[in-house]
Amino acid sequence: MASPEASSSGNTEDLRIEDLFHQKRNEDTIAKIFSIIYAPVGLIILLIRVFLGFHTFIVACLLRKSAALRMHTLRIMCSILGIVVEKSGHRDESARVLCANHVSILDHLAVDILTPCLLPSVWDIPSIIRWCFGYVDLGATRGRDQLVSRAKQLLTREQMPLLAFPEGIITSGEKALIKFNTWCFEVSSVVQPVSVRVWRPYPWKVSVSVLGSSWWTDLFYFFALPFTVITVEYLPKMERRENESLEEFTARVAETLAGNLKIAVSKFGISDATEAAKRLRTDRERAKKVVVREKTSPRLADPRQMDECAMRIKQSFPSFHLSAIRRDLEKTRSQTTTVNNLKAGKISSSASDGQTGKVTLDAGTWRGVFDNRKWQMIEVNRQKYMNRDS
């Protein structure tokens, strides 16, 4: 019988790092149409909830974090804001570290409403803002050793548990988990895994987060859509076995959490996810520049301009025939569009387009025959020039 680790690795062999994230907010056509119709209503709901959200924030700051009144009040107010938090499983008070998967920007809020906890801050932000949002400065920006040391000190003087997201980045939670960071398992040998699931009803089934999105964009959809259900499930606590290494304990917790979510544990780490986000952001910026360039650049109209453009493109794509490039330029009247067609394989690399070079009695084809012979001659002489030293 195959081990869970072997089965998990087999399931993730074909996974790309991009597969662990949502690429688009909404990929369903019917849902997109419904979203357009719903937009005016959504904006009104958004404005009302922004006003209510400010009051919720004030309540969260004024009431003591561990008070039962705060938990019940926040849970009711969050439901009005469209953030419905559901709980399953039993919270084991002997576990001082909660280890959860990360699927949205409000995961820590959902867990904190059910179990007041401490969340390490990974940003260098002012103390007042950190206090308002419930973060604690454990020196994460100053290195792992500082983070682990200060986390251990915090647990000795605080009654509330420490909440950690060992993935380090928000994923879709549908394909696989990011490989866990081991720091929180070094803080305590007893941890309680917490699985977090997010659900939205159809046709408002909009992704809670996409790769490279900003926090305020994610929050916009939380407030604009009717409601979002965040389910928090407490799994049985797990203890580090005798003679079990830190990496083995981390992997075992990850496998347990992945098994509860019915997904696998990927081979990718936080650095791979960060690089994927950078690539996506770069591709989006490049695509925007291309669109702007397409709108602002004049269309090729003069045959002489198209001839010069064809020669420039030929230098970058030497395997394509000049006549094929020139013919596509006549259709697109755009250098960028023709280059994209070449990359997409929409243009044949040969010169043939139905013109054999034979002069027919139809005067309408004479121009095409002339152009075909001209570009054929240019191509032949160009090849001779390129091969002159060989």
Curated annotation (Swiss-Prot):
Per UniProt, residues of the CUE domain are 305-347
Which key words tag this protein in UniProt? Endoplasmic reticulum, Lipid droplet, Membrane
Q: List the disulfide bonds.
A: none
| Stretches of the chain forming a coiled coil according to its record | none
GO CC terms in record: endoplasmic reticulum membrane; lipid droplet
Location within or outside the cell: Endoplasmic reticulum membrane; Lipid droplet
* Intramembrane region list: 33-53
Alphabetically, the GO molecular function entries are:
acyltransferase activity; ubiquitin binding
Where the protein is mainly located, per its record? endoplasmic reticulum
Top-rank taxon, per record:
Eukaryota
Tell me how this protein sits in the membrane.
Peripheral membrane protein
Q: Per the record, what ranges lie on the membrane's Cytoplasmic side?
A: 1-32, 54-390
Q: Which Gene3D superfamilies match?
A: DNA helicase RuvA subunit, C-terminal domain
List, alphabetically, the PANTHER family matched.
Answer: ANCIENT UBIQUITOUS PROTEIN, LIPID DROPLET-REGULATING VLDL ASSEMBLY FACTOR AUP1
Name of the protein:
Lipid droplet-regulating VLDL assembly factor AUP1 homolog
Species, as recorded = Caenorhabditis elegans
